[in-house]
């Protein structure tokens, strides 16, 4: 017994005419007749009495119709539900981002992406670069926004997007707090709050390099990893901190943010932000995000 045989039987039972039933099924009358004969053989009973003028259901045919018709209707409903579910199943794009990207570039990017591609669900994971990269390599993320570094996995594509502007976070009571710009040379005696290098190598190295280029040694007063914690420590008067410009959005009471200059008076812009993804993986959603990013990078970079 096959599903197609049961469908042919129900069509013939409803039409009581082989020609119309065959047309309804989209097959030839001879094919319809063959399906019915095979069904009767498998059940070992006559389901229809047929003459050249009429078709009628036998008692067994009536009993079978009562059982089969609701079953076929339910199967049809289930098939439609399955097809609809598959059609509506959204693509998921898994995005990893360091705090700088999550606070600056990502919000306007995701706003535009969701408007342009409403059928793609975006999942955002915020973490440090050293944790995001292994997740990308393992296939748990589709694209990450990180601080690029030398020696990344050769199976990754890494594209630098922008250079974030570092500023100095100072307590509002600090003598330099009202300045429009501050030279690194003016921070020679300033107690600094820096992240641990093992967790945030780019941020740590940036501070070290700025002082090294100025021929100075930084005075490290405290280490802390999270930007919110660092800014809170600045507010408490523990010290000052060189941080990305976006941290001003944290709006912690008692802290001001002043642009930095090198000793020669040139404004700084030395915190690279990059996108990375798996070289061998094809992902239309990721590629659409990258295309949108390429088109609007100047506007998004303003938030960095």
UniProtKB/Swiss-Prot annotation:
- State the SUPFAM superfamilies in the record: Periplasmic binding protein-like II, Winged helix' DNA-binding domain
Q: Which UniProt keywords apply?
A: DNA-binding, Plasmid, Transcription, Transcription regulation
Q: What does this protein do?
A: Transcriptional regulator of the ttuABCDE tartrate utilization operon.
Kindly give the InterPro entries that the UniProt entry links to this protein.
LysR_subst-bd, Tscrpt_reg_HTH_LysR, WH-like_DNA-bd_sf, WH_DNA-bd_sf
Q: Per the database record, which ranges form the HTH lysR-type domain?
A: 1-58
Q: Does the keyword Transcription apply?
A: yes
What family classification does the UniProt entry report for this protein?
Answer: Belongs to the LysR transcriptional regulatory family.
> Source gene?
ttuA
- Source organism per UniProt: Agrobacterium vitis (Rhizobium vitis)
Keyword match Endoplasmic reticulum: no
The name this protein carries in UniProt is: HTH-type transcriptional regulator TtuA
Q: Which residues bind DNA?
A: 18-37
Pfam families from the entry? HTH_1, LysR_substrate
Going by the entry's taxonomy, the superkingdom of the source organism is recorded as Bacteria
Annotated Gene Ontology cellular components are: protein-DNA complex
The molecular function terms in GO held by this entry are: DNA binding; DNA-binding transcription factor activity
């Amino acid at each position: 017994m096959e599903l197609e045989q049961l469908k042919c039987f129900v069509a013939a039972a409803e039409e009581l005419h082989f020609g119309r039933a065959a047309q309804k099924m989209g097959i030839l009358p001879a094919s319809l007749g063959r399906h019915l004969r095979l069904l009767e053989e498998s059940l070992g009973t006559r389901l229809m009495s047929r003459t050249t003028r009429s078709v009628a259901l036998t008692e067994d045919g009536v009993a079978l119709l009562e059982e089969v018709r609701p079953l076929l209707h339910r199967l049809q409903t289930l098939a439609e539900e399955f097809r609809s579910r598959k059609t509506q199943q959204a693509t998921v794009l898994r995005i990893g981002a360091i705090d700088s990207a999550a606070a600056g570039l990502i919000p306007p990017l995701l706003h535009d992406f969701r408007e342009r591609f409403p059928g793609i669900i975006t999942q955002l994971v915020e973490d440090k670069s050293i944790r995001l990269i292994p997740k990308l390599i393992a296939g748990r993320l589709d694209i990450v926004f990180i601080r690029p570094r030398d020696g990344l996995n050769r199976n990754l594509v890494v594209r630098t997007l922008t250079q974030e502007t570092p500023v100095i976070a100072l307590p509002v009571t600090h003598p330099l707090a009202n300045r429009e710009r501050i030279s690194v040379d003016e921070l020679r005696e300033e107690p600094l709050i820096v992240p641990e290098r093992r967790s945030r190598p780019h941020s740590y190295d940036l501070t070290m390099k700025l002082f090294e280029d100025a021929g100075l040694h930084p005075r490290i007063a405290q280490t802390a990893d999270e930007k919110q914690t660092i800014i809170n420590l600045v507010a408490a008067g523990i010290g000052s901190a060189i941080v990305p410009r976006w941290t001003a959005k944290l709006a912690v009471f008692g802290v001001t943010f002043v642009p930095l200059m090198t000793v020669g008076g040139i404004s700084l812009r030395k915190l690279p932000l990059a996108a990375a993804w798996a070289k061998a993986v094809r992902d239309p959603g990721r590629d659409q995000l990258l295309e949108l990013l390429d088109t609007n990078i100047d506007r998004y970079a303003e938030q960095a």
